[in-house]
UniProtKB/Swiss-Prot annotation:
It comes from Porphyromonas gingivalis (strain ATCC BAA-308 / W83). Pathway: Purine metabolism; AMP biosynthesis via de novo pathway; AMP from IMP: step 1/2. The lineage of its organism: Bacteria, Pseudomonadati, Bacteroidota, Bacteroidia, Bacteroidales. It holds the Pfam family Adenylsucc_synt. It catalyses: IMP + L-aspartate + GTP = N(6)-(1,2-dicarboxyethyl)-AMP + GDP + phosphate + 2 H(+). This is Adenylosuccinate synthetase. GO terms for molecular function: adenylosuccinate synthase activity; GTP binding; magnesium ion binding. GTP binds at G13, D14, E15, G16, K17, G18, K19, G41, H42, T43, R304, S410, V411, G412. One of its GO terms (cellular component) is cytoplasm.
């Protein structure tokens, strides 16, 4: 019996998972999303074209692979339709290569309104959601009031009506306007018809059956481990488990059937929206990282906050996920820096710690180690033998600090700009 390999981000998202899953998929038969929704996007460059995938697994560009939207995902039929139709116009017909779990929850039009209403009600305490209705959908799921993909097959109208009325009562209590709901709802209902073109499956049986028959499965996470609802920088987190454990609950896979865990991180660190960020830079260096790394959200377009790499946070997420292989992205962004800093510890209340704290507050001061930069372009490097000495030293330093080997290094956005190390 085969095991599921897992690919996930180790920081606050935007690590480059889309590109790497596209690199890895030739080795797998099935690519499956296990959590999250359209609030996070994977940017891929394929045959010179740039694509942003929000709900659809990144294996969609690889021939006859089966792509699965798992039960842990929350799905907006309207945004899914827009995404799928855009891919179809580019020559990528999904209907024969994408299946959807019946147990995946649906993001309703009123969930979007609830998202906005809840943020407005928080005033200065808002956490900066993307407004896609993710949180309210997971709230309904946990409170056992959710609408699932499988409900589209029978009893949908009544279940939808009951959920909608409940949402409207909440919106009215918050004095939030619903004048735009009718138009959104009409388009959403039309999109559910489009959704029915795809095969609905009991994905837990599909995945486990595939493993039993010797097929290889890659589970693809969204966002990053530091946004995990339990272990992230709460309350500035997402509404699902983004760590490896989320693969088990989001696909129906037993823990003993998890194989390699690929942990992706950038050679620096970024964050979108509100929330603590100990190594954030507010100077020209931060602006330079943003410019060179093109750090703007693939879904929201928001400028990402940038800072030096945080090894305290990385050690924490490596531990949580049981990472077996590391993948370093955007090494080329660091090409021009004469000195590179890495946070190796935090100072809190005058005491130094290497552990990730309960609260990431303003009282956390990063303790840095400085390393010499390589100050030459990495974008045309094709093998580890061509690495500058300073870059090889940087990798060796990271591996010693993190306790896991770096198996893959990315030196540019294209698939070809990926170096598989012989370590």
């Amino acid at each position: 019996m085969e095991k599921v390999d897992v690919l996930l981000g180790l920081q606050w998202g935007d690590e480059g998972k889309g590109k790497i899953v596209d690199v890895l998929t030739p080795h797998y038969d099935i690519v499956a999303r296990f959590q999250g929704g359209p609030n996070a996007g994977h940017t891929l460059e394929f045959n010179g074209e740039k694509y942003v995938l929000r709900s659809i697994p990144s294996g969609i560009f690889q021939g006859e692979k089966t792509n699965v939207i798992g039960n842990g995902v929350v799905l907006d039929p309207l945004l899914f339709k827009e995404e799928a139709e855009a891919l179809a116009r580019s020559g990528h017909d999904l209907t024969k290569r994408l299946v959807i779990s019946r147990k995946a929850h649906l993001i309703m039009p009123t969930h979007r309104l609830l998202d906005a209403a809840n943020e407005m009600a928080k005033g200065s305490g808002k956490i900066g959601t993307t407004g896609k209705g993710i949180g309210p959908t997971y709230t309904d799921k946990v409170s056992r009031n959710g609408l699932r993909v499988g409900d589209l097959e029978h009893g949908f109208e009544e279940a939808y009506s009951v959920a909608k009325e409940r949402h409207l009562r909440i919106l009215n209590s918050l004095n939030y306007p619903t004048d735009k709901l009718a138009d959104l709802e009409e388009r959403w209902m039309e999109a559910t018809k489009y959704l029915r073109k795809f095969e609905f499956v009991d994905s837990e049986f599909l995945i486990n059956g595939a493993l039993l028959s010797g097929k290889k499965v890659l589970a693809e996470g969204a966002q990053g481990s530091l946004l995990d609802i339990d272990f992230g920088s709460y309350p500035f987190v997402t509404s699902s488990n983004t760590i490896c454990a989320g693969c088990c609950t989001g696909l129906g896979v037993a823990p003993r059937n998890v194989g390699d865990v690929y942990g992706i991180f950038k050679a620096y660190c970024t964050r979108v929206g509100a929330g603590p960020f100990p190594t954030e830079l507010f100077d020209e260096t931060g602006d330079k990282l943003c410019e060179l790394g093109r750090e703007f959200g693939s879904v929201t377009g928001r400028k990402r906050r940038c800072g030096w790499i945080d090894l305290v946070a990385l050690r924490y997420t490596i531990m949580l996920n049981g990472v077996t292989k590391l993948i370093m992205m955007k090494s080329d962004v660091m090409d021009l820096f004469p000195t590179i800093k890495a946070c190796v510890a935090y100072e809190i209340d005058g005491k130094e710690t290497r552990n990730f704290p309960f609260h990431l507050t303003e009282g956390v001061t990063p303790v840095y180690k400085e390393l010499p930069g390589w100050q030459q372009s990495m974008t045309n490097v094709v093998s580890e033998a061509d690495f500058p000495k300073e870059f090889s030293d940087y990798i060796a330093f990271l591996e010693k600090e993190l306790g896991v080997g770096i198996a893959i290094v990315s030196v540019g956005p294209d698939r070809e700009q990926t170096i598989i190390r012989q370590a």
